[in-house]
UniProtKB/Swiss-Prot annotation:
Main location, first listed in the record: secreted
Disulphide bonds in the chain: 63-89, 65-105
Xref: SMART domains: SCY
Gene3D superfamilies documented for this protein: 2.40.50.40
Keywords assigned: Antibiotic, Antimicrobial, Chemotaxis, Cleavage on pair of basic residues, Cytokine, Disulfide bond, Growth factor, Mitogen, Secreted, Signal
GO biological process: antimicrobial humoral immune response mediated by antimicrobial peptide; cellular response to lipopolysaccharide; D-glucose transmembrane transport; defense response to bacterium; inflammatory response; neutrophil chemotaxis; positive regulation of cell division
Subunit field text: Beta-thromboglobulin is a homotetramer.
Entry's family note: Belongs to the intercrine alpha (chemokine CxC) family.
Name of the encoding gene: PPBP
Protein name, UniProt field: Platelet basic protein
Organism, scientific name: Homo sapiens
Disulfide bond recorded as keyword: yes
Post-translational events: Proteolytic removal of residues 1-9 produces the active peptide connective tissue-activating peptide III (CTAP-III) (low-affinity platelet factor IV (LA-PF4)).
Function comment: LA-PF4 stimulates DNA synthesis, mitosis, glycolysis, intracellular cAMP accumulation, prostaglandin E2 secretion, and synthesis of hyaluronic acid and sulfated glycosaminoglycan. It also stimulates the formation and secretion of plasminogen activator by human synovial cells. NAP-2 is a ligand for CXCR1 and CXCR2, and NAP-2, NAP-2(73), NAP-2(74), NAP-2(1-66), and most potent NAP-2(1-63) are chemoattractants and activators for neutrophils. TC-1 and TC-2 are antibacterial proteins, in vitro released from activated platelet alpha-granules.
Organism phylogeny: Eukaryota, Metazoa, Chordata, Craniata, Vertebrata
Subcellular location: Secreted
Amino acid sequence: MSLRLDTTPSCNSARPLHALQVLLLLSLLLTALASSTKGQTKRNLAKGKEESLDSDLYAELRCMCIKTTSGIHPKNIQSLEVIGKGTHCNQVEVIATLKDGRKICLDPDAPRIKKIVQKKLAGDESAD
């Protein structure tokens, strides 16, 4: 009766699969790290100021407008941005860029703001 021990462990056949699993996990980790660092700021060493990366590349995952106003004269508005309801926010948001560069949130339910939005969309600059 000859008992020969198998000198090759049975786990050798599973090593390529294990290596693939490790590589997959590492690639997922690197992908997650790379995407999380894109939104961080970088330091401008020449000026000593922080400047943020281009914010147009990233979508906000929450409502942009916390406080709204309806008391704005249409002649002060340079442009309007209307953001519809979505998964990020359950209300319509109207963001006005003023001629001095500031951005303010307008109340989309106010009759005056509705009229301003309609006139701006129609291309009429004389909305009252």
